[in-house]
UniProtKB/Swiss-Prot annotation:
Main location group: cytoplasm
Protein name from the UniProt record: Restriction of telomere capping protein 4
Pfam families: RTC4
SMART domains to which the protein is assigned, alphabetical: RTC4 (SM01312)
Domain of life: Eukaryota
Gene: RTC4
Region spans: Disordered: 22-58
Protein function: May be involved in a process influencing telomere capping.
Length: 388
């Protein structure tokens, strides 16, 4: 009977390979090395099983060694939420399976498709040890570097990436709340609008688009767009040049890029013919859609910002000689948008775009074992429309 390569079922992509070679053992060898066994001649299958058992015992010793190393690295487990969990290695609980390479690859591909959790569970290669922890927790305890030093170098790459990942889902929500509270305190920002709400908010100011297209309204965003065009040697904006742009100059601050792009698409749908017929080299270089999203949309949102935050021109904005010494409302709004880009990226862009998405958001927060009332975007809204 030929022996197939045996593989051990483990956590992660890679499985342990146990290649059984030269498994023919005679009675004398068996009795001398293992007196407890019967004097009956062992078959090839029995020999294979016996070799696997030896490897399991070695694996158990290695597991205990790694376990002690990690416990020493942590120094203190009591009083923290860190847990070291070890699967039992006892009679009948070690599973061995025979698989082909193609089956192993399928398992590996399926493992890669699984989303990362807020609490990472790492399977150390060649062991049955699992280390459960949150990276945010490790940093506060000053143990992040210690655990990395104890992780085997041959650890599966995907699992290693989960260890050094700076923010997990849970950590991000904590960071998001900090940013939201900080910017709301400093700037007293209005609530983050849903898709339909922001479209309704821009409708009264759509005439500004006509003024911009006719060049009757000065635009800081247009000036930045023109400068990008002048710095280019290409006839149109390439993907490489777009990635190299400092998009913070073209983002409408606390509204976030997702909502800004929705506004840009709305503008393009209404004024498509006018935008496509523009003779401006800057507009042609950007292209109609990007020009709508990164030049016209933020200018339109400046007008919405003025209304939401109650901004007004300074009394001395214009003097008798028509030379302003104060600041205009649009200038104030532009400054606020530039100062709140981080809020837009971290908070607005990750807040629900539709009312019904709030339920999904809160379910995710609950799964992460965080306070729903504290971390939900619902808390920061004045009046939440009915979720249908």
């Amino acid at each position: 009977m030929s022996n197939k390569g045996l593989k051990r079922k483990t956590y992660g992509k890679r499985s342990l390979n146990y290649s059984i070679k030269n498994s023919k053992l005679n009675l004398n060898q068996e009795s001398s090395e293992h007196s407890s066994r019967s004097n009956t001649e062992l078959s090839d299958d029995s020999a294979s099983s016996f070799e696997c058992e030896d490897r399991v015992q070695d694996d158990e010793s290695y597991t205990n060694g790694i376990s002690n190393q990690i416990i020493n690295a942590f120094g203190v487990l009591e009083g923290s939420n860190l847990k070291v969990e070890e699967d039992s290695v006892s009679n009948g609980e070690n599973e061995f399976i025979t698989t082909t390479n193609s089956e192993e690859e399928k398992i590996a591909d399926a493992d890669d498709e699984q989303p990362l959790d807020e609490i990472e569970v790492v399977k150390l290669k060649d062991t049955k040890l699992h280390v459960k922890y949150g990276s945010h927790e490790l940093k506060h305890l000053g143990l992040f570097d210690s655990i990395l030093q104890k992780v085997p170098l041959k650890l599966h790459k995907r699992k290693k990436r989960t260890i050094i990942k700076e923010f997990t889902q849970r950590d991000f929500l904590i960071k998001k709340l900090e940013v939201r509270a900080k910017y709301n305190k400093e700037f007293k920002l209005p609530q983050v609008l849903y898709h339909d709400e922001i479209i309704e908010a821009i409708k009264p100011y759509m005439d500004i688009i006509i003024q911009l297209l006719k060049g009757k309204l000065q635009s800081v965003y247009y000036d930045s767009a023109k400068q990008a065009f002048l710095n280019s040697e290409r006839a149109i904006l390439s993907a490489h040049e777009f990635r190299a742009l400092d998009l913070k100059k073209f983002q409408a601050g606390y509204y976030g890029l997702r909502r800004q792009l929705c506004v840009g698409e709305y503008i393009y749908d209404i004024y498509k013919e006018k935008i496509c017929s523009l003779k401006s080299p800057t507009a042609r270089w950007w292209g109609p859609r990007d020009f709508s999203s990164y030049v016209l949309a933020p200018e339109l949102l400046i007008s919405v910002c003025i209304e939401e935050m109650g901004l007004k021109d300074d009394p001395n904005y214009f003097d008798d000689n028509n030379e302003g010494s104060g600041e205009s409302a649009r200038s104030k709004a532009y400054s606020i948008l530039q100062d709140t880009v981080k809020f837009g990226q971290i908070v607005a862009d990750t807040d629900p775009m539709q009312p019904w998405e709030v339920l999904s958001e809160e379910k995710n927060i609950e799964n992460l074992q965080l306070n729903v009332a504290k971390y939900s975007s619902r808390k920061w809204r004045i009046a939440l429309p009915k979720e249908t």
